[in-house]
Amino acid sequence: SILTKKINDERGACVYCGQCNRSCKVYGDFSSSSVLVRPAILTGNVDLITGAMAREVMTDNEGKATGVSYVNKFDNQEYQINAKVVILGASTCETARLLLNSKSTKHPNGLANSSGVVGHYLHDSTGAAMGGVIPALFGRKRYNEDGVGGMHVYTPWWLDNKKLDFPRGYHIEYWGGMSQPGYGFGMGMQGMNGKFQVNGKTKEAGGYGESLKEDVRFFYGANVGMGGRGEAVPRFENKCSIDPDVVDKYGIPVLNFDCKNSEYEIKQAKHMK
């Protein structure tokens, strides 16, 4: 989510630079660090503890949460913080891991898990993608096209499920243009310079050095692609659970994952193509 207009002196409006993964310098996007944590610290009423790997939520004899036990990642020692209220916001799987690791007499199956569903109904987005190149765009003049992408071109779901053999839906995202190169840009060049001439020259696939740099510049901005991102059906049998034998480097039991796509997700992905 982005801000389309300035709301205060702390956050500005999105300028559509398209580099959200590099963090937003005007705080126009939503992220917990800039929108929640930073303003909270500025109040002077919040202590932020970094390098803390939460182990479990501590409870009293009545089974009520009393604080958190964590391992300091720098000295590998365990510490405890007492609290009147404990809120977990550790993402889907890590929150489930904390709850399942927080066993006690009152909570033998893990905290807040009397229903037995913590960790179950785990699902992700479905997806299928395709890409290609437009030869007419080879070697073109450089422009700043950082904003081109999902922010500008998007196809929402509009089909009638009654006429399809799967539930839910998906949207389609598009990408391409001369966006700012990131890590890995230009890799796989053997699939390009072995098929198309570069500035009128036929080359072998691959290459290195000055010739490879020429090829990367020549093909830059000619790639286009589209990808479908859909909604899966939550099912009880798809789950994460605590591994009884494996712990991480801090001695905290890790998660096992048991998930697979149903025929609905497979049919949805085929429909995307």
Set out the residue ranges of the language-model regions.
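Conserved redox-cofactor binding core of oxidoreductases
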Residues: 1-54
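Hydrophobic alpha-helical scaffolding
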Residues: 10, 23-30, 88-89, 112, ...
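Glycine- and acidic
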Residues: 18-24, 82, 253-263
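Glycine-rich loop(s) and the adjacent beta-strand/alpha-helix scaffold that form part
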Residues: 26, 43, 52, 56-60, ...
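Short amphipathic alpha-helical segments and helix-helix/interface helices
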Residues: 37-38, 119, 273
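A broad structural signal for short, well-ordered beta-strand segments within beta-sheet-rich domains
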Residues: 53-54, 65, 236
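Short, hydrophobic/aromatic-rich segments at coil-to-beta transitions
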Residues: 63-69, 223
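FAD cofactor-binding and catalytic pocket of flavoenzymes
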Residues: 115-266, 270
